[in-house]
C-alpha cells in the first residue's frame, strides 16, 4: 500500500506536474478483484471485511474481469458538496464496529458507505504513471452510487498559490486536508514523497490513560500528554474502556477522574496545536485502537 509523506513546501518542485485532490477522513481500504472473488481489506485487517459493507461488495462484484485488479481508496460516509466530500467519521466508526448481521444490513441502507477510489493496480498499471492510471479509472466508474473514483480538483506545475486557496477552502469546511501527487509517480508499496498529505489538523497517537465522568459515564478520555478529549464513545469501545482496571480515582468540581493501572488502548487525535506544556488545543477523537495495532 502506497502511503503519503507529510507536506513540506520544499518537497514540491516547479519542474513537476501535480494532481490535487481531497484528503478524505475515512478508513483506508483495498478491494481485491480476482477469479470471481471480491475481498474488501482494511489497512490493518487480517481478514476480508466484505460482510460489513454489503452495499460496496454488490457493486464491486460487477467490476470482476479476467484480470486481477486492486482498487486502492478510502471507505467513507459522506455527502457531496461541489467538488468536496463532507465526511462523517463517527458514522463510519459505527459501521466499522458493528458485528450484528441485522444491524449491518440496516446500517447499509441508513448510513451507506462510499468507497472512493484514488488508484487502480493491475499487472499493467503498476508500470504506468499516475496520470495514465487516473485515465484508466474513468472507464471503471460512473454508474455506481457507492463505488466511485476520487474527484481530481486541479493540476499544478509547482505553483502553490491555487493549492493554498484549496487548502484554505478545505480548512473552512472542516475537512481533513488535501493530497498533492506527482502525475508521473509510479505506485510504490511504501511511504513516498511523490504523494504529499497536507492536513488541516495535526494528528497524534496517544495512550489513553483514563477517563472522566461528569455529564456521561464517559465524558472525556484522559491522554498520556495530560490532554483531555471530549467524545461520545460508541458501545464497542465504551464496553472495553469500562472493563479496564482502575488504579486511581480523583474527584474535582463534580468531575470524577479514573486512571487505568495498565493502559492498553491508543487514541488517534486531530488537533490544531499544542500549548507550551504539551496540551492539545481543540482535540478531536478520530479513532481508538488496540495499543499494539
Listing of model-derived features with the role each one plays in the protein:
Residues 15-143, 272-293:
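Covalent nucleotidyltransferase
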Residues 1-43, 123, 142-270, 274-279, ...:
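Nucleic-acid 5′ end/cap handling module spanning
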Amino acid at each position: 500500500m502506497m502511503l503519503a509523506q507529510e507536506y513540506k513546501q520544499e518537497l514540491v518542485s516547479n519542474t513537476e506536474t501535480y494532481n490535487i485532490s481531497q484528503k478524505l477522513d475515512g478508513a483506508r481500504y483495498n478491494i481485491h478483484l480476482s477469479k470471481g472473488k471480491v475481498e474488501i481489506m482494511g489497512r490493518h485487517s487480517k481478514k476480508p471485511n466484505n460482510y460489513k459493507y454489503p452495499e460496496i461488495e454488490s457493486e464491486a462484484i460487477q467490476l470482476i474481469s479476467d484480470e486481477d485488479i486492486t482498487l486502492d481508496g478510502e471507505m467513507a460516509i459522506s455527502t457531496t458538496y461541489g467538488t468536496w466530500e463532507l465526511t462523517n467519521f463517527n458514522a463510519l466508526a459505527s459501521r466499522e464496529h458493528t458485528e450484528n448481521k441485522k444491524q449491518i444490513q440496516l446500517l447499509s441502507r441508513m448510513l451507506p458507505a462510499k468507497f472512493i477510489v484514488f488508484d487502480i493496480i493491475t499487472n499493467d498499471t503498476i508500470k504506468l504513471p499516475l496520470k495514465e492510471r487516473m485515465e484508466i479509472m474513468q472507464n471503471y466508474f460512473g454508474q455506481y452510487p457507492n463505488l466511485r473514483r476520487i474527484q481530481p480538483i486541479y493540476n499544478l506545475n509547482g505553483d502553490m498559490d491555487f493549492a493554498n486557496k484549496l487548502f484554505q477552502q478545505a480548512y473552512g469546511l472542516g475537512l481533513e486536508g488535501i493530497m498533492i501527487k506527482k502525475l508521473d509517480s509510479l505506485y510504490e508499496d511504501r511511504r513516498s514523497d511523490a504523494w504529499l498529505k497536507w492536513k488541516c489538523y495535526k494528528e497524534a497517537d496517544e495512550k489513553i490513560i483514563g477517563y472522566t465522568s461528569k455529564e456521561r459515564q464517559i465524558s472525556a478520555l484522559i491522554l498520556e500528554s495530560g490532554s483531555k478529549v471530549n467524545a461520545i464513545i460508541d458501545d464497542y469501545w465504551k464496553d472495553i474502556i469500562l472493563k479496564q482496571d482502575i488504579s486511581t480515582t480523583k474527584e474535582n468540581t463534580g468531575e470524577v477522574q479514573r486512571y487505568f493501572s495498565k493502559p492498553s488502548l491508543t487514541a488517534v487525535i486531530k488537533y490544531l496545536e499544542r500549548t507550551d506544556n504539551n496540551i492539545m488545543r481543540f482535540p478531536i477523537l478520530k479513532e481508538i485502537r488496540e495499543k499494539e495495532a
